[in-house]
Amino acid sequence: MSNQSLTPPFGPQDVEVLERETPFQGFFRVDTLTLRHKHYNGGWGEPVRRELFVRPPAAAVLPYDPVRGEILLVEQFRVGALEWRDTPWCLELIAGIADKDGESAADLIRREAVEEAGLTLGTMEPIAAYMPSPGGTNERLQVFVGHADLAGAGGIFGCPDEALIACCRFRRNLPW
């Protein structure tokens, strides 16, 4: 690999939004954009239409008990997995979307940990911030590892029968 910068050469000024419509507004929103953008040869491309699934920022946490050497995952039904997996119940990190103005990602995750798993998180460390699928959504996701006492973890939390807690033990401690 060459010694090139990983910073893209283009920015927002290199995109021209010609039209933006909102054909769907529900719990989430879908926008249809007609836009054009610069090409690597320096010229502007022809207008294209793109659908954008508009989502608030999201955050997730991997609860980790360094004393017990365990992590916690939440099992929940997910409609998005209905057609792509053997089962639409997924083992996941505790996660949520920002639904309160001004709530930080860390505060969001502390709230979700209580709501989804009855957990109080201690020290939290950020481990990633990324856009999971920027070709079709503007969602931004921040991921943390959070120390927690998982000794009494387990059961069903959140809405009735919404989340089942699963703890997994490791043979050695993780670096967090």
What are these regions (language model features)?
Residues 50-53, 67-111, 153-162:
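Conserved Nudix-box catalytic region and its N-terminal flanking loop in Nudix hydrolases
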